[in-house]
Amino acid sequence: MAGRSGDSDEDLLKAVRLIKFLYQSNPPPNPEGTRQARRNRRRRWRERQRQIHSISERILSTYLGRSAEPVPLQLPPLERLTLDCNEDCGTSGTQGVGSPQILVESPTILESGAKE
């Protein structure tokens, strides 16, 4: 069901039920009262939501034996990353948007340091 090898469906369902119960036990605040009272209720509600979120992450890591966060993306070394603006860079509002160019060799301009 979960699509992950090694994870028990029953453990996953148990964790999901527990997390669902935690979120249901913290309904949104009542919209009545003075502005300050409403603000305080919202602030306390958001803090409880943050606590529930952190508890949910701990539940997932305990029940499933792994972190809820995805594995970080492996990036190439910084020496291989370059900015290539030979193509149309667009207007000033869209500069820098797009996929990075990766060159196999470092450009000679960066290596020499001499002015031509």
From Swiss-Prot:
The answer to whether UniProt assigns keyword Mitochondrion to this entry is no
Q: Where is this region: Disordered?
A: 23-49
> Could you state what the record's PTM comment says about this protein?
Asymmetrically arginine dimethylated at one site by host PRMT6. Methylation impairs the RNA-binding activity and export of viral RNA from the nucleus to the cytoplasm.
Q: Which residues carry this modification: Phosphoserine?
A: 5, 8, 92, 99
Which cell locations does it reside in? Host nucleus, Host nucleolus; Host cytoplasm
> Gene3D superfamilies recorded for this chain?
6.10.140.630
List the biased-composition ranges (Basic residues).
Answer: 36-47
Q: What is known of its domains?
A: The RNA-binding motif binds to the RRE, a 240 bp stem-and-loop structure present in incompletely spliced viral pre-mRNAs. This region also contains the NLS which mediates nuclear localization via KPNB1 binding and, when the N-terminal sequence is present, nucleolar targeting. These overlapping functions prevent Rev bound to RRE from undesirable return to the nucleus. When Rev binds the RRE, the NLS becomes masked while the NES remains accessible. The leucine-rich NES mediates binding to human XPO1.
Q: Give the miscellaneous note.
A: HIV-1 lineages are divided in three main groups, M (for Major), O (for Outlier), and N (for New, or Non-M, Non-O). The vast majority of strains found worldwide belong to the group M. Group O seems to be endemic to and largely confined to Cameroon and neighboring countries in West Central Africa, where these viruses represent a small minority of HIV-1 strains. The group N is represented by a limited number of isolates from Cameroonian persons. The group M is further subdivided in 9 clades or subtypes (A to D, F to H, J and K).
Give the protein name, as stated in the record. Protein Rev
Species this chain originates from:
Human immunodeficiency virus type 1 group M subtype B (isolate HXB3) (HIV-1)
Source gene? rev
